[in-house]
From Swiss-Prot:
Sorted UniProt keywords: Allergen, Cytoplasm, Pathogenesis-related protein, Plant defense
Protein known as: Major pollen allergen Bet v 1-B
One GO MF term attached to the UniProt entry: signaling receptor activity
Entry's family note: Belongs to the BetVI family.
PANTHER family: OS08G0374000 PROTEIN-RELATED, STRESS-INDUCED PROTEIN SAM22
Top-level taxonomic group: Eukaryota
One GO cellular component term: cytoplasm
Biological role stated in the UniProt entry: May be a general steroid carrier protein.
UniProt-listed InterPro entries: Bet_v_I/MLP, Bet_v_I_allergen, Plant_def-hormone_signal, START-like_dom_sf
A GO BP entry: defense response
Length: 160
């Protein structure tokens, strides 16, 4: 098994606390609402949302995958940090054992935020992750962020 790391940063005009609340803490209900073309639903299979919780993310018809299951590893409200692992489903395929993800949202002096994202791909056997595959995953995550950001800009009273 190999482990391939991919780190990226992206900025948002939304303040860190508000973005953490909307994108991370309430994302299970907000993201299917603002990006139904990407995610149909998110349901807790086990747990209450904290560490150890297992979530099932269902994708819309026509998507390359039907679902994935994720395990919440850490929710740090004080530092706007969230860690989770993708543990089952189509996105892992025959080549990945799991994907461990960490998102940390940092406030910027201008009132916006920076999302620092770390992904660790745990491969099966001697499989290697291709840069274009990791880039495609980053672009999908960025699209979800922009959908949430647009919603928050249009609804200034939401998730404060």
């Amino acid at each position: 098994m190999g482990v391939f790391n991919y780190e990226t940063e992206t900025t948002s005009v939304i303040p860190a606390a508000r973005l953490f609340k909307a994108f991370i803490l309430e994302g299970d209900t907000l993201i299917p609402k603002v990006a139904p073309q990407a995610i149909s639903s998110v349901e807790n299979i086990e747990g209450n949302g904290g560490p150890g919780t297992i979530k099932k993310i269902t994708f819309p018809e026509g998507s390359p995958f039907k679902y994935v299951k994720e395990r919440v590893d850490e929710v740090d409200h004080a530092n706007f940090k969230y860690s989770y692992s993708m543990i089952e489903g189509g996105a892992l395929g025959d080549t990945l054992e799991k994907i461990c993800n960490e998102i940390k949202i940092v406030a910027t002096p201008d009132g916006g935020s920076i999302l620092k994202i770390s992904n660790k791909y745990h491969t099966k056997g001697d499989h290697e992750m291709k840069a274009e595959h990791m880039k495609a995953i980053k672009e999908k995550g960025e699209a979800l962020l922009r959908a949430v950001e647009s919603y928050l800009l249009a609804h200034s009273d939401a998730y404060n």
